[in-house]
Amino acid sequence: MNYDKLFQNVINNKLTDLELVLTDPENNNLVLNLHKIVLDINCPYFETLFSNNFIDSNMKKLNLFVEDSYITRDIIYNFYGQTNRSTDYPDWLYQLKKIKCQNFLCMKPDFYRLSDFVFDKDNFDELLNTIDSIGYDDKVVSLIFKNMPVDYDLVKFPIELLNRMLDVSGFYIMYYDNNRFSMYNQYCEFVVFDGISDFDYSPNSQIIYVPNSQEIVYVSEKIVVFNIETQISRITDSINPVSSKNYPTLCPDQEHIIYYNNKWDAICKFNVKTMKLIGTWRASNGSEINMDENNGTYFFDSIGCKIVFSPSGDKFVLITDGIICYDVKTIKVCWRFNKIVPLSRVDLGYVPTCIRDVMYSLCRKYIFYLTKYGLFVINSSNGHLVSEMKVRGISICHITCDIVAILTYDNSGIIMYDYQNNMIISELNFSDNICFGGESKICMNYFDGKLFIIGSNNTNRIDYNYIINISDFTYEKNFTEKIDKSYYVCDNDIIKYNNCCNNCFNIVTDFKSVLRDKIKNHIESIN
């Protein structure tokens, strides 16, 4: 159909059979000469009006009182293939008014365009009033939580809605793409920092989320801190003369990060508030060093290097070809674990890097150390080996206090391992010729009991993502076509897929933790 010619008939009042008068609260009156058949096909409101025995169904002239006459006209003209915008409202306000106009016309409101905007304290009520007039679903509730000011009066919300906010806001994946930071989960996606300029992104960079200050720390050759609430960034001069990853980790005080500088074999501590480097220490022995005077070469192979804090926050471990445990305050070495070859001394075959993953047990007594040779369970207090299992693992996460899930190369599946009894209790093998990449990651969303695999792909260059339901071990496969971006979008919006070549993403389970705690306390005070 030639929409331009059809629209020209509207402008010229040619072959039209309805005069539509739009009036809004600002007394803006617009007269449109339109075709009933076009309105009937594109709009449920007019379809109902024209197909039933309403008084107005056969009239040649119709008057409508709408939220905004100009935006309603934009919507109607879109039926004719036009995309013009008739107002100079800010983008966020135009979209809110458009939603109300769509709702009046019985059209599906375009809520999800709102995820492109960052609403501040001054316009949050506008967002809330718009949504309140339409209704709520999980995506909308996520959008409200994301934009809600920490000091907002929670009395305005029903308890059921506050409980749902807690349910949908416990698990996100944050990533950088197209000059913005965004977050997504199985309910929604939204922008948290937009319009980034004067910023050279590096594919070897990594990001950290700081919940207390609502900031994103970007670590590469430079360190950049992005404040989500103020939309202001601050940047250091180049302090990391490195060519590969730094593996930064947030300290428990949420004011410092610790990262590994592979050029100098140095552990570095950086204050994200003052944007100053606090100090550097030799990773091999914990001795303090002067970076300006260091001309040595690195001792550790940085591929697969990780830094993990103990649950108590008083120690951290650096994992490379072994494990070194340090005291947080002094950076002195507490113990070492150098064993990476199992007792059987059987190399389980090629794995891209030796070290794949590491984490503390929920009971805090053990460290799970996943290498290409197997899984080692280590006593976290002294570094002694407790048990080991032969497995070519990629990533590991907790399921319960006693059970962990291991994403494997072998049969491209998942092993459920009871480490207390040193036994495999169940396995899931994928049947779609899947080949997990080195950057694939398995993680548990404890808020809805589902297991995520991020970054999976098959050998035919068709990429898949999975959401595994632990209760019955069934899994949902989300088909995506390979596209030239740093992430892949699934049609059903269950999850996005991060490109294995782009590691600038992070799992966030404490997004707006201050607000979450406030909501929890408010609910408890009422109950």
Swiss-Prot record:
Residues 16-89 form the BTB domain. This is Putative BTB/POZ domain-containing protein R225. Gene3D superfamilies: Potassium Channel Kv1.1, Chain A. Belongs to the mimivirus BTB/WD family. Transmembrane segments: none annotated. InterPro entries: BTB/POZ_dom, SKP1/BTB/POZ_sf. CDD domains: BTB_POZ_ZBTB_KLHL-like (cd18186). It comes from Acanthamoeba polyphaga mimivirus.
